[in-house]
């Protein structure tokens, strides 16, 4: 079924009639129009003009369908550009032209204008039309009759944050000055004569400059441009103005504007918006004229004639208010005994102003995370009500929230529509969707009417009630579906309509309650940061209800056709999953975008596998002869199809919250249900004894489903929770920009760091020109803010320790930028002082150091994050390719189809392995081992997907169906691109984290060790060739030089890697080169040394040194990847100690130190440990005393060994060779005694753990003594 629409192509000034499917989205419609007419382009959209009494003007959203907007045949839509130039004027007369998006509402356009002008707090500004009326912030320009040629005025509507505007914000200061000046002159802010004189003098200083006695004399000023009307004829007023002006000599224009604004702020009526109202006073029939004034703090009521203030109330005293066509009613609760009813032609404007001020107040409290005190809770129940015939209307909806003093609740437009049938319910739902959209902070809109409910409920109770009402709405929706599909047995159409109308009323009552609750969520400090998500879920529920009601409204009579039933059932599935989504939203548990997309693609894969199975199943039904079994199979086929739809709908809704237990449970249950039904279908066909070949085909399809379900389970295991990160410094949010979707943070860090370095260099070069310093500073600050924004994005994915480290870094950068700002301003004021120049240079250098460190640290985390994300993207795209391949195999010759299916199966196994690697990194994100394992898996498991891509592209031309061929080619290209992205991410990870240098280093060490082992074989065989022309003394000297160089490089590596991880690659490269030099020198020495035993000893020590260096390199990578991690640093220290011991042993064996006793002691200890303490089984001691005796002897021997070791150290330091030999023999003897007692203790104890502990401790102590002797020999050799 299609509909015919008249499309007015505005650019070509023609109208064409085209046909569209009702379920086409607006984007598809625009593409269709472009293809048919060759008019327009990406900037064009569809616009529905205003229809009096039926439809307000609106732009149709690209993602919505024609059916959603209830577009019927023969209606006309405009096809035109969304953007147009629009002129707006400032109060100083300046006219600016800006390109605006017509589809945006006024609030969004004002946001855009303010952003370009550098105006903060855009929510306080709005546009005024030529008649002096404020435009409605929630409506588009064309809806309010603003054409391209009209000029609107940008003005400050709300005076709330203007106290924060100072001399450093010249744009806003100028706009505020002009608006204050006009307000004073027009009499909006009544002033005394002295106040008017002071303000006029400041205005003279701004506009005329310093006082000039020859020029500035009475008669010079046009007084009506400086004074309000009431003081124009005051005696000597111009002379008094110049008298005050004379006092302001040398005051700058900016300071004069600032003083002017400050003085205006001190006025009681400052920022007051006035409305002419009438009040019927007690005992009088005639209405009395008054002025109602509203400021950021209070409401004032004044007599029109005398301007006497007869009533004031802080805004927080207003319990509720209501606007009708010609009146406005205020309820002050306990502060007044009666309602204040005002007759006014502008009730809606008053309502908007009060609502706007309170919204800004509550937003400011929410943003600063302040807890609302008890005395402020009155503002929490301020509400707007619909009032008819002067009475305050009570709303029956949502009375449980904000019940402070029994106040009534706001009746939004969506709540004012009486629900008499499904179409009225549908209109109310559409209005509710618009209202919810206005409440989302991301839109920047300022909704007209807020329902504010700071309630006595705790956040947990609030969440519980919100979820309860959501559940109730879902139950009501299920009831509506049953009524639609199962009409009442009696009563006919009337009973049917009555039943579904009653259901619609229940649905709308609950839906409005949910919508109201969602709006109030933002005013709970604990929920403010994720209130948009809650509103988003409420919006989705409303949209789903709208679609369900639309389906119901199309039912003719009492019969719901199969297509409508299926569409309605889909919405019921949708609503059920959205109930769970609301639970997750209230708990603020969301996963990363890559995790969500992966899960959705896996669900699509399952759904496609089920669809393939259903195709086969439906084609084999004809083989079933048993009618009972046939009915069972047909029912199972139908229920499996529904479950597949439910799975896809549920996963698409809940994928973003798959870390929440309820979301995961629901997805798992539906997935398992689909699997069970598939197996049941297979069993039923088997009972029907269908041909074996057909059964095998069906079995293969069920196997595909099982594989796809496994991928869903893996995908949920890989889900990563994402956190919203807020970093503040001195109460100021740091890094307020946004990261665009799809931004490669790894590349972004490199780019921003480079831009920041260039900006700092530019600033340094501009120090000779004070006029350009601030511009240079702004560039530096902009790049620093961008870097902080990127860091926040990375921190949202990091572990707690890394987050804290990044927070500290961003705060340090922010404070450094602030210091740089202060120094720049001081320099501009006094450019001659060299101290300011020095401070700028010093602070800029410090900032550069901080940003480089932060960029390196966050960049590494971004690398592993990108590796995970691109792994998931690859899995998602390849999963889609698997699904497409399975379907495509049916269109290929048998042999080719089998090959394609086999390739798909191989890929499923590869994806499962890769997801296991992702899961490990998610569970332990700091582990270098799991990161390297994921990197290896990503490289290895990318081969099967690429093979499948190659197979698909090879077989694609053979596919008979052209559409399927195109799908396979498209899916293959997407999969190939995702694999390429993953490979690039892997290379970036290795490059940025220093892993390329480390991998090269490890390869060098493997090669060196292999070469040493070859030399070891040559030594054992006796065919090691000496190097001609090389003496042992010369080789030993070269080795000592190489060892000293290695020692220096290793010290630098161990020290610098802790404070500057960015140097990992350079440090590792230097250490590898030095170690290679040591190995080459040691090999030369071995060739120049005679005697196999000596050669073997040197070779063994050199080989051990290379192994220890390899471990040192690995440990340094761990420290660089996990800064300030105690475990990694402990590993580095241990590896460094092992290298030192091996180096000392090599020096001791190399040096020509004639100390026979020392060598003998070292050999004796080695033999002792290997023979007597090699293992528990080798201990054959026969103790003669008790276990306790030997424990005491071990302690005594340990003390003796310690004393002997200290003597060895003393002799080595004094280079007393003779004393060193004697001390070494004593130490060996003490160790021998200790070993003997340890053996006896091991034999006596029956505890295996104690045995192993004594053995390990003794062997370790012996190893340390050997190392000590080697160090001593190295000391004697001047090492």
Swiss-Prot record:
Q: Which domain of life is it from?
A: Eukaryota
Q: Does the keyword Cytoplasm apply?
A: yes
Keyword Zinc: yes or no?
no
GO MF assignments: actin binding; phosphatidylinositol-3,4,5-trisphosphate binding; phosphatidylinositol-4,5-bisphosphate binding
| GO BP of this protein | actomyosin contractile ring contraction; cell morphogenesis; cell-cell adhesion; cell-substrate adhesion; cleavage furrow ingression; mitotic cytokinesis; phagocytosis; sorocarp development
Cellular component annotations (GO), alphabetically ordered: cell cortex; cell trailing edge; cleavage furrow; cytoskeleton; filopodium tip; membrane; pseudopodium
Gene3D superfamilies to which the protein is assigned, alphabetical: 1.20.80.10, Alpha-catenin/vinculin-like (1.20.120.230), Phosphatidylinositol 3-kinase Catalytic Subunit, Chain A, domain 1 (3.10.20.90), Pleckstrin-homology domain (PH domain)/Phosphotyrosine-binding domain (PTB) (2.30.29.30), Talin, central domain (1.20.1420.10)
Report domain FERM positions: 84-365
- InterPro entries linked to this entry: Band_41_domain, FERM/acyl-CoA-bd_prot_sf, FERM_2, FERM_central, FERM_CS, FERM_domain, FERM_f0, IRS_PTB
Which keywords does this chain's UniProt record carry? Answer: Actin-binding, Cytoplasm, Cytoskeleton
Q: Which CDD domains match?
A: FERM_B-lobe, FERM_C_Talin, FERM_F0_TLN, FERM_F1_TLN
As for subcellular location, the record says: Cytoplasm, Cytoskeleton; Cytoplasm, Cell cortex
Pfam family, any one? FERM_f0
Q: PANTHER family from the entry? A: RHEA, ISOFORM B, TALIN
Q: What does this protein do?
A: Actin-binding protein that may be involved in the control of cell motility and chemotaxis.
Q: What is this protein called?
A: Talin-A
Q: From what organism does this protein derive?
A: Dictyostelium discoideum
């Amino acid at each position: 079924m299609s509909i015919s629409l008249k499309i007015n192509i505005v650019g070509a000034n023609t109208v064409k009639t085209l046909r569209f499917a009702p379920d086409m989205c607006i984007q598809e419609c625009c593409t269709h129009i472009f293809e048919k007419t060759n008019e327009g382009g990406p900037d064009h959209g569809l616009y529905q003009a205003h229809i009096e009494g039926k439809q307000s003007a609106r732009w149709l959203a690209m993602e919505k369908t024609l059916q959603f907007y209830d577009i019927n045949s023969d209606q006309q839509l405009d096809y035109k550009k969304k953007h147009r130039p629009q002129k707006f004027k400032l109060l100083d007369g300046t006219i600016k032209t800006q390109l605006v998006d017509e589809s945006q509402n006024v609030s969004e356009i004002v946001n855009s204008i303010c952003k370009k002008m550098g105006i903060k707090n855009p929510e306080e500004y709005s546009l005024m039309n030529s008649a002096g009326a404020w435009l409605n912030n929630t409506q588009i320009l064309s809806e309010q009759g603003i054409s391209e040629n009209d000029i609107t005025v940008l003005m400050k509507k709300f005076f709330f944050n203007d106290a924060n505007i100072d001399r450093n914000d010249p744009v806003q200061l100028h706009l505020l000055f002009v608006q204050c000046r006009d307000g004073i002159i027009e009499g909006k802010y009544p002033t005394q004569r002295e106040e008017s004189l002071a303000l006029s003098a400041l205005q003279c200083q701004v506009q005329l400059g310093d006082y000039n006695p020859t020029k500035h004399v009475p008669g010079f000023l046009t007084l009506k441009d400086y004074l309000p009307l009431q003081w124009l004829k005051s005696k000597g007023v111009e002379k008094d103005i110049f008298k005050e002006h004379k006092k302001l000599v040398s005051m700058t224009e900016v300071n004069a504007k600032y003083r002017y604004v400050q003085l205006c702020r001190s006025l009681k009526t400052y920022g007051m918006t006035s409305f002419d109202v009438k009040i019927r006073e007690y005992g009088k029939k005639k209405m009395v004229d008054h002025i109602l004034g509203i400021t950021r703090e209070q409401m004032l009521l004044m007599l029109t004639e005398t301007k006497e203030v007869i009533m004031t109330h802080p805004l927080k005293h207003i319990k509720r208010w209501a606007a009708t066509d010609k009146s406005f009613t205020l309820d002050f609760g306990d502060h007044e005994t009666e309602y204040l009813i005002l007759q006014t032609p502008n009730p809606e404007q008053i309502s908007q102003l009060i609502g706007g001020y309170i919204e800004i107040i509550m937003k400011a409290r929410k943003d600063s995370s302040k807890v609302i005190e008890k005395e402020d809770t009155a503002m929490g129940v301020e509400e707007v009500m619909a009032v008819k015939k002067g009475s305050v209307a009570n709303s029956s909806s949502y009375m449980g929230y904000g019940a402070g003093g029994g106040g009534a609740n706001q009746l939004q437009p969506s709540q004012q529509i009486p629900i008499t049938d499904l179409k009225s319910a549908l209109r109310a739902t559409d209005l509710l969707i618009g209202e919810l959209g206005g409440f989302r902070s991301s839109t920047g809109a300022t909704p007209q009417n807020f329902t504010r409910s700071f309630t006595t409920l705790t956040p947990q109770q609030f969440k519980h009630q919100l979820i309860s009402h959501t559940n109730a709405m879902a139950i009501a929706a299920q009831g509506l579906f049953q009524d639609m599909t199962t009409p009442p047995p009696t009563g006919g159409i009337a009973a049917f309509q009555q039943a579904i109308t009653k259901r619609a009323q229940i649905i709308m009552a609950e839906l409005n309650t949910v919508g109201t609750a969602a709006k109030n969520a933002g005013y709970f400090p604990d929920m403010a940061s994720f209130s948009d998500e809650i509103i988003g879920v409420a919006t989705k529920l409303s949209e789903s209800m709208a679609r369900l009601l639309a389906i119901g409204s199309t039912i003719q009579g009492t019969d719901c056709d199969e297509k409508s039933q299926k569409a309605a059932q889909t919405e019921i599935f949708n609503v059920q999953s959205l109930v769970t989504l609301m639970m997750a939203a209230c708990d603020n548990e969301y996963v990363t975008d890559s995790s969500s997309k992966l899960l959705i693609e896996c669900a699509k894969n399952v759904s496609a596998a089920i669809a393939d199975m259903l195709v086969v199943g439906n084609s084999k039904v004809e083989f079933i002869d048993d009618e009972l079994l046939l009915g069972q199979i047909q029912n199972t086929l139908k229920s499996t199809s529904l479950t597949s739809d439910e799975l896809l709908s549920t996963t698409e809704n809940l994928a973003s919250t798959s870390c929440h237990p309820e979301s995961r449970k629901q997805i798992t249950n539906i997935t398992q249900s689909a699997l069970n039904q598939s197996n049941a279908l297979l069993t039923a066909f088997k009972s029907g004894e269908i041909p074996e070949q057909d059964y095998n085909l069906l079995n293969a399809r069920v196997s595909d489903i099982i594989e796809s379900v496994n991928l869903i389970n893996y995908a949920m295991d890989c889900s990563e929770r994402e956190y919203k990160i807020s970093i503040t410094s001195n109460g100021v949010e740091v890094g307020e920009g946004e990261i665009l979707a799809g931004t490669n943070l790894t590349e972004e860090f490199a780019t921003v760091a480079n831009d920041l370095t260039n900006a700092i260099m530019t600033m340094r070069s501009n120090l000779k020109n004070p006029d350009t310093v601030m511009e240079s500073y702004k560039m530096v600050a902009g790049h620093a803010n961008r870097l902080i924004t990127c860091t926040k994005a990375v921190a949202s994915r990091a572990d707690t320790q890394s987050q804290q480290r990044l927070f500290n870094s961003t705060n340090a950068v922010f404070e450094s930028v602030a210091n740089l700002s202060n120094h720049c301003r001081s320099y501009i004021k006094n450019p001659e002082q060299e101290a300011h120049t020095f401070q700028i240079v010093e602070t800029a250098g410090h900032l550069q150091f901080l940003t480089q460190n932060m960029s390196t640290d966050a960049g590494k985390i971004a690398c592993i994050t990108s590796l995970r994300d691109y792994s998931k993207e690859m899995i998602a795209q390849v999963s889609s390719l698997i699904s497409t391949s399975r379907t495509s195999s049916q269109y290929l010759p048998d042999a080719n189809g089998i090959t394609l299916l086999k390739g798909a199966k191989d890929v499923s196994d590869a994806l499962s392995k890769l997801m296991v690697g992702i899961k490990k990194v998610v569970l332990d994100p700091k582990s270098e081992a799991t990161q390297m394992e994921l990197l290896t898996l990503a490289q290895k498991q990318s081969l099967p997907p690429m093979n499948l891509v190659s197979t698909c592209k090879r077989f694609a031309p053979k596919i008979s169906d052209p559409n399927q061929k195109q799908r396979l080619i498209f899916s293959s290209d997407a999969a190939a691109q995702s694999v390429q992205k993953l490979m690039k991410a892997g290379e970036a990870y290795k490059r940025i984290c220093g892993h390329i240098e480390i991998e090269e280093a490890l390869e060098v060490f493997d090669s060196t060790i292999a070469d040493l082992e070859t030399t070891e074989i040559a030594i054992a065989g006796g065919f090691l060739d000496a190097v001609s022309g090389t003496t042992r003394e010369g080789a030993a000297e070269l080795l000592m030089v190489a060892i000293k160089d290695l020692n220096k490089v290793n010290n630098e590596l161990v020290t610098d890697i802790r404070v500057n991880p960015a140097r990992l690659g350079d440090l590792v490269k230097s250490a590898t080169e030095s170690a290679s030099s040591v190995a080459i020198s040691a090999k030369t020495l071995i060739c120049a040394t005679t005697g196999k035993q000596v050669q073997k000893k040197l070779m063994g020590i050199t080989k051990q040194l290379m192994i220890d260096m390899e471990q040192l390199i690995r440990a340094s990578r761990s420290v660089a990847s996990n800064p300030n991690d105690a475990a990694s640093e402990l590993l580095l220290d241990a590896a460094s100690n092992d290298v030192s011991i091996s180096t000392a042993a090599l020096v001791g064996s190399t040096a020509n130190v004639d100390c026979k006793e020392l060598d003998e002691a070292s050999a004796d200890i080695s033999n002792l440990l290997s023979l007597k303490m090699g293992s528990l089984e080798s201990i054959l001691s026969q103790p003669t005393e008790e276990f306790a005796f030997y424990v005491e002897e071990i302690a005594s021997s340990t003390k003796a060994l310690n004393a002997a070791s200290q003597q060895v150290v003393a002799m080595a330091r004094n280079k007393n060779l003779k004393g060193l030999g004697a001390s070494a023999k004593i130490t060996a003897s003490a160790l021998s005694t200790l070993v003997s007692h340890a053996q006896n203790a091991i034999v006596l104890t029956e505890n295996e753990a104690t045995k192993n502990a004594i053995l390990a401790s003794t062997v370790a102590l012996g190893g340390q003594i050997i190392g000590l002797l080697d160090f001593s020999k190295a000391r004697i050799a001047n090492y």
